[in-house]
Amino acid sequence: MLFRSVAVLMAEGYEEGETLTIVDLLRRGGLECHTFSFNEEFVRGMHDMYVKADKLFNGEIKNYDMLVLPGGRPGGQNLLENQDVISLVQYFNEHHQYIAAMCSGTVVLEKANVIKGKKVTGYTGYQDKLVSGDFVNEVAVFDQNIVTSQGPATPYPFSFKILEVFGKDVTEMKEGLMYNFAGGK
């Protein structure tokens, strides 16, 4: 099996629970997963947790198999307002690379114009913000090259969906994490 790599963007105000859970589960699942910050080595999350990013945002990201956009306030908005992020999302889409976004990070996909005709989901009430996609009320959705999820309570199913996109069987991981026991499906 090919080795797969994932780049997770950490904008100031990122949602810690989403971001750190995603990174943890993808690494447990055997993917090469790196976090990227924009200006500083340490990035402040929306609940004032400072986390050291693995790398600074650069052109190297284009070599990754997947780009992940977590949410957060103002993390999602900071991603949305960054033209380099919009251009990177468009690049990934044009080159048929995977893009994953959750919560407020999903609006970046709309602005980048990469979800037209694709099933997507996002934070509660985001139907009006994801108008070019086919909004569905599901926890995690994969359509063509796009993975989306709803919000702070959904990074587990989101991460499992990403692992499955890369051909990973998550059955044992779910058992080891007691995910099904805790009510996960």
Task: Name what the model sees in each region.
Residues 46-55:
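Short gly/ser/thr-rich secondary-structure transition/capping motifs
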Residues 4-10, 14, 25-38, 54-55, ...:
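Active-site-adjacent pocket-lining segments in enzyme domains
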